[in-house]
Amino acid sequence: MLHRYLPMTEEDKKEMLQTIGVQTIDELFSDIPESVRFKGDLKIKEAKSEPELLKELSQMASKNANLKEYASFLGAGVYDHYAPVIVDHVISRSEFYTAYTPYQPEISQGELQAIFEFQTMICELTGMDVANSSMYDGGTALAEAAMLAAGHTRKKKILVSSAVHPESRAVLETYAKGQHLEVVEINHKDGVTDLDVLQSEVDDTVACVIVQYPNFFGQVEKLADIEKIVHQQKSLFIVSSNPLSLGALTPPGKFGADIVIGDAQPFGIPTQFGGPHCGYFATTKAFMRKIPGRLVGQTVDSDGKRGFVLTLQAREQHIRRDKATSNICSNQALNALAASVAMTALGKQGVKEMARQNISKAQYAKRQFEAKGFTVTFAGPFFNEFVVDCKRPVKEVNDALLQKNIIGGYDLGRDYKEHENHMLVAVTELRTKEEIDTLVNEMGAIQ
């Protein structure tokens, strides 16, 4: 009888050794010097039964701070939002439970229709013409947008606002290094991109300008002013945007953005260390044949019935590797489905209401902080995040808050030396008045 987890008998081992022409395991590894081979027994615990293992793992997991027991004011790209119950039900169905797009799309019409609906909803939110089937995360989508711009314009310089998420900028740097592109950061002023600096840097060598809306500090960038500067030199205008915010803010497409990218995590995708997330990538018809990743199109079959296909596949590396628009040859189909189900369950009015609640609750929190004597660093309009001056190390504040079952905001000093002791506070629709008041009061007591 085979072991449940180790399905190899001694006979199996003998047969495998005979097949490759050796007599023993030691002979198989004879090329490895004796001096570096491990000898003796591994110092690991004895095997446990399933009930024992489950109990031990549960005890370990209980040490984590989870969002069922803690009120989270931590955002910075990953947010604690409401996910309709139906999301988990739908994505758990066996027909959908895969992260991959099919290579024989005609046999997976349901999967392709779900992706098509995702693309459609992203276009509606962003005000763009076409969206792909998703990307790994927001950082990947941003870097891919920059690569598209560099390839299209044949220019080598990329301007990115320092108010763009630091981790997305790090991904961009990695991509750019391999392509021998120059990345220039544009400083922020009063929490938004410094337009004077931007104006001085934009010239005929610039492939694109990248800003975030709302930006990393939660501030709403002046896209209309930025667009005028960017397009003077025929550079591409790339906007990274929180899709939920577009339920309340004017979409970037209305401001003349050439590419809109971001992370769909606010829609139905839980907070989890390291992902997975779901990047989105939307653009205009002018760049439809240069967009990276999968594209699902709607068509009609020989019987006149509606059908869905993977279209424009010649762009992709599994078709023409040497001429592919991107090395991305996959997507986040399962998380894209989760985002689609969440948006569908909420509906247009639900998305708008969810965005409105984020704004109103964040505004309430800001007023409470100010009433308690805290300085809210930036005075401009914001969505659901704002910066508070803690007057002391943010880590100390957050350690104290954890004792009160509160997950505090992001420590901006990790990425911006000039913002040391400043906390980025995120307030979503899930936070209650009582939780907000407790946060402010506890931080006031720590001052």
Curated annotation (Swiss-Prot):
One of its GO terms (molecular function) is glycine dehydrogenase (decarboxylating) activity. It catalyses: N(6)-[(R)-lipoyl]-L-lysyl-[glycine-cleavage complex H protein] + glycine + H(+) = N(6)-[(R)-S(8)-aminomethyldihydrolipoyl]-L-lysyl-[glycine-cleavage complex H protein] + CO2. InterPro entries: GcvPA, GDC-P_N, GDC_P, PyrdxlP-dep_Trfase, PyrdxlP-dep_Trfase_major, PyrdxlP-dep_Trfase_small. Pfam families: GDC-P. Gene3D superfamilies: Aspartate Aminotransferase, domain 1 (3.90.1150.10), Type I PLP-dependent aspartate aminotransferase-like (Major domain) (3.40.640.10). It is an enzyme of class 1 (oxidoreductase). Coiled coil: none annotated. Its EC number is 1.4.4.2. SUPFAM superfamilies: PLP-dependent transferases. GO terms for biological process: glycine decarboxylation via glycine cleavage system; nucleoside metabolic process. Keywords: Oxidoreductase. It comes from the Bacteria. The keyword Secreted does not apply. Belongs to the GcvP family. N-terminal subunit subfamily. The glycine cleavage system catalyzes the degradation of glycine. The P protein binds the alpha-amino group of glycine through its pyridoxal phosphate cofactor; CO(2) is released and the remaining methylamine moiety is then transferred to the lipoamide cofactor of the H protein. The glycine cleavage system is composed of four proteins: P, T, L and H. In this organism, the P 'protein' is a heterodimer of two subunits. This is Probable glycine dehydrogenase (decarboxylating) subunit 1. The gene is gcvPA.
